[in-house]
Amino acid sequence: MIGKERIRIRLKAYDYRVLDQSTGEIVDTARRTGAQIAGPIPLPTVKNKYCVLRSPHVDKKSREAFEIRTHKRLLDILEPTQQTVDALMKLDLPAGVDVEIKAFGKEHK
């Protein structure tokens, strides 16, 4: 890949430890192939809260509250080489990590 191209990678996971491990693997792989990295940038954590009745029939006052947090990271790989793209495609990330990859060409700023 030639020019001012970049790859933007967004990672999402419920467990921040697995997310940080996956981010580290991607950063190490990209640096080994000679690409420049911008990030990892931690994005705001989304907290979803759910309230459930404890009793199946009565007692509206008795409730159970649950919370699930979605942690996010953003990585930009600047001026990736073909070797970088091949290494990222072969990378095996743990389950539970959602990876979204977008490639931008010269026209995007």
UniProtKB/Swiss-Prot annotation:
Q: Which Pfam families match?
A: Ribosomal_S10
What's the name of the protein?
Small ribosomal subunit protein uS10
Extract the GO molecular function terms from the UniProt entry: structural constituent of ribosome; tRNA binding
Q: What does this protein do?
A: Involved in the binding of tRNA to the ribosomes.
InterPro entries named among the record's database cross-references: Ribosomal_uS10, Ribosomal_uS10_CS, Ribosomal_uS10_dom, Ribosomal_uS10_dom_sf
What organism is this sequence from?
Koribacter versatilis (strain Ellin345)
From its record, what is one biological process in GO terms? translation
Q: List the disulfide bonds.
A: none
Q: Which family does it belong to?
A: Belongs to the universal ribosomal protein uS10 family.
Task: Extract the PROSITE patterns matched here.
Answer: RIBOSOMAL_S10
Gene3D superfamilies of this UniProt entry?
Ribosomal protein S10 domain
Q: How does it assemble?
A: Part of the 30S ribosomal subunit.
UniProt xrefs under HAMAP family: Ribosomal_uS10
Question: Is Ribonucleoprotein tagged as a keyword?
Answer: yes
Cellular component terms (Gene Ontology)? ribonucleoprotein complex; ribosome
Keywords from the UniProt entry: Ribonucleoprotein, Ribosomal protein
Gene name per UniProt: rpsJ
